[in-house]
Amino acid sequence: MHGIIVAGSTGEYYAQTDKERIWMMNRCAELIKNRVPMIVGTGAIRTEDSIGFAQAAKAAGANGLLISTPPYAYPTGREIALHALAIDRAANLPAMLYNYPGRMSVNMDAETLDRLGRSPNFCAIKESSGDINRVHMLARDYPHIALSCGMDDQALEFFAWGARSWVCAGSNFAPEAHIALYRSCAIEGDFAKGRKIMSAMLPLMSVLEQGGKFVQCIKHGLTLRGIDAGPPRKPLQPLNKEDKRQLAEVIHTMNKTISNITGEAI
């Protein structure tokens, strides 16, 4: 693991009060103790709120920011860029952009990316659109913005196109499997082994993306690992017994299969 993101989508930032979010930044900084970089999400509808979170993150000792498009507002490419640049001016920290049109309704388009080239702080992008053509475009046209996989079932393709980071919620409870795929593809360049590992991971990815149960699955995955992450924030509800059984079975099978592929115990 090379870093920890606080207040991302999986962290349920959208269901927390401002006070809770700022407390979480500071608490995570205390626990991480500079062992790995801490990146803090600034997501909010209002630019002013995102700026406030960015400044609080810097005060907490964050090493970088995660900057997404404002939800619901449906801003243009120019407006997204102005939003991100305002956050950048306020905090002056390295920033990973977060493109997630499935939740935010808009893409960070070429106009956005071109305008953000005004600041060297925009050094990476977590691409979660699911559109493989955007992966091609980012790798080809914006090589100065490091490509990070934000769509788990496309991890192999991201690595093939040069991505050297993967922001993956499943790694919270199954780090060994995710690291095995990352190591095989991004470090060793062994895509033959990577395809085998990816094939073993796809059932888990299908369970996580079954619709409306992503956060609940992550939290229960942590419970299976002996970590109490608490219930999901309302309106979300915990998994039912059958969902829990299915998740546990899929994780067990995945770990056993990947262990056989890599020769390392999980």
Q: Where do the model's predicted regions map?
A:
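Active-site beta->alpha loop and helix N-cap motifs at the rims of alpha/beta catalytic domains
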Residues: M1-S105, I261
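A general structural signal for well-ordered alpha-helical segments in protein cores
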Residues: R21, M25, S50, A84, ...
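C-terminal alpha-helical cap/extension of soluble enzyme domains
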Residues: M1, A160-A163, G170, A174-I266
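Conserved, mostly hydrophobic/aromatic
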Residues: C28, A57, I87, I125, ...
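Catalytic alpha/beta core domains of metabolic enzymes, predominantly
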Residues: R89-A90, P101-L202, S206-E209
